[in-house]
Amino acid sequence: QLLALRMRMRGIQCYILAPIKGHEFRRACNKIGGEFIKIVPGSPHCINVMEIRHTLSPEMELIDEIDYVEMGSMLARKIQQLMTFFGLLIPDMSNEEEQMLDEALIRTYADFGITHDNDSIYTDMSSAPPKMKQMPILGDLHKHLQENPMTQRLAAIISRFVTGSAQSFNRQTNVDLSNKY
């Protein structure tokens, strides 16, 4: 807690993942204006694992003279993160299943108009900050996996997070992830 508080005082974003006794952090979190998020099945809180988040702030882009268009595809980076996530969830995934999952992810994002063009994640680039498109959720990916006979096993494993006991993960993000603590 002390380390997190020190980081907060320096303006460094800090997350504390406490699966066993997380409730012990609630009071400290609330005292400094933090966001206490309880991620469990049935929780009202949700972080959409499929959400593409713009990682650089406009201020940092100006300071570092980085153009987000030159950073590479945000979609490709997100798909890499999701492949890691699903690799942990399904450790015995075959190479063929990985390829099919990759293709299903690309199709799922395409359904929402999201491509490798970084501008495609925004609905309005003229506003500050730019307004982002609605992102797909696990249920959208699940539909694509169910359609392909070669990804039925993946669909069955993921169904727990779509219609099963952990279906609270099948929603849009409803917490403030930009909060520093």
Predicted regions and their residues:
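P-loop NTPase nucleotide-binding module
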Residues: 1-19, 23
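Short hydrophobic alpha-helical runs that function as membrane-insertion/retention elements
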Residues: 14-17, 35-39
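P-loop NTPase motor domains
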Residues: 22, 26-35, 41-43, 50-181
